[in-house]
A protein has these predicted regions:
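Short, contiguous, well-ordered secondary-structure segments
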Residues: 1-2, 108
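Generic secondary-structure boundary signal with a strong preference for alpha-helix termini
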Residues: 19, 33-36, 107-108, 131
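N-terminal single-pass transmembrane signal-anchor helix
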Residues: 4-31
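Conserved amphipathic alpha-helical interaction elements at protein-protein interfaces in regulatory
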Residues: 3, 33, 37, 56-60
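Low-complexity, acidic interaction segments enriched in glycine
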Residues: 48, 52-132
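Short, contiguous strand/loop micro-motifs
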Residues: 3, 40-41, 78
Length: 132
């Protein structure tokens, strides 16, 4: 009488688990850093889009919005039957408002525009800004 073998032995299952754990340990550090890097690239792209909207505003109005008006003024329709410069208020990838100042304090012309970055604190090295 022959004994048929069904399923895997405990040793075989343990080897598979060890292999999967080793692969995860090698891949995970690369994936974790990529999410933050992707958010930084999105913020840089957002700053470029905001620059276009601000430049269009300046062409229409003769000046950039004041710091008090802020970026929110870009979501107001330009005039009767006209679309706003932005469809919705601009939030960075960390769901915080972009910082806007006009006149600029970090540049000799124009405006300052920045995201506080991952840490949410202004003036730290992870900030994404339109100067430097």
């Amino acid at each position: 009488m022959r004994c048929s073998r069904n399923g895997f032995t405990l040793i075989e299952l343990m080897i598979v688990v060890i292999i999967i754990a080793a692969l995860a340990a090698m891949v995970a550090p690369n994936l974790i850093g990529r999410a933050d890097e992707a958010k930084e690239k999105i913020a840089e792209g957002d700053l470029a889009k905001l620059k276009i909207a601000l430049d269009l505003y300046r062409l229409d109005k003769g000046s950039y919005p004041t710091s008090e008006q802020g970026l929110a003024t870009l979501t107001v329709p330009r005039g009767p039957g006209q679309e706003p410069y932005l469809d919705k208020p601009a939030l960075d990838p960390w769901k915080r408002k972009y910082l806007y100042r006009f006149p600029a304090t970090h540049r000799s012309y124009g405006y300052d525009l920045s995201s506080m970055g991952r840490d949410g604190k202004e003036g730290t090295e992870d900030d994404i800004k339109n100067w430097e």
